[in-house]
Amino acid sequence: MNPANNEKIDQMFDAIYKEAEKRRNEFREDPVPKIHIGLATCGIASGALETKKAFEDALEEYNVDARIHTVGCLGHCYAEPVVIIDHPDSGFPPIFYHEVNAGKAKMLTKLFLKEGDPRFEHVYGAMEENDLIPSVMEFTRFNREKRVVMEKCGHIDPEDIYDYIAEGGYSSLVKALKLNPDEIVKQVQNSGLRGRGGAGFPTGRKWELANSAGEQEKIVICNADEGDPGAYMDRTILESNPHQVIEGMAICAYAVGAKKAIIYVRAEYPLAVNIVTKAIRQATELGLLGESVLGSSFDLEIEVFRGSGAFVCGEETALIRSIEGYRGCPVTVRRIRFKKVCGTSPRSLTM
């Protein structure tokens, strides 16, 4: 990569990061209470939208100055609607409240935000170690977890790209753009990263095959289709941290030489579809997608494809047939086959 090009990439991203940092600092340094409300599908299904509206109405009714910060799924769906209240002037650490319906929202606004009584009977735990309230980290459900993929879920606003960038988002893409694609593939191979399916196919090997597939048009496909009853891992990530998925796809596309990518997600996930579509638009507006990503020679267009919800389309060959406009049925091919037809021209695909 040209050093002058690297400098341009750094300059463009630094300007974006400074804006993100400014917004984050303004939010954190604002002395008013912060109300964090989970608005992923699990929360909404439990009444989180009504909870949010109740907080908004109660803040106005009791003349309380506070900020509402919507986030994704914290991973504790059994406790929804989940609300975390950070009230600096109360002397208490940020508090995790569970099953906060509209009535509890009004009560907490009056008694805690206005009068300083945290109502311990509704407290699940504190979000920080302290001497007043048991920390959630003391509970088995928390202290045995080491979050990797979901580390930021439930802490950032999935509909605010600056929230993600302020937490280090897109910095890996910046690093990748300064490397040769072969170097990226080598790093992925050395990491030992594998697919989470039964075969556990090495990701680095898959990227290597796609990278070496020649000059034909290449497409990266994100398989976010889930047919197993009750499965919602992909939905949770797309709803709670969509830019993490987009950044990973961008790195993959750069490494294998693709200029187009598709997120295949079932139409039965309307919230995930809407959030990731908005995230793609935000990233494009900031120059993190589209033509000349961050001033580099790398172009990438990402689109969302809505699947019809067929169970079998979670299988990659059926998924590709669905994208092509055919009925989503598996076809008998080798486990990894990169020369396929998508539309009318030969292309190389990596999942």
Q: Where are these predicted regions, by residue range?
A:
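Feature of Fe-S/electron-transfer and energy-metabolism proteins
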Residues: 1-351
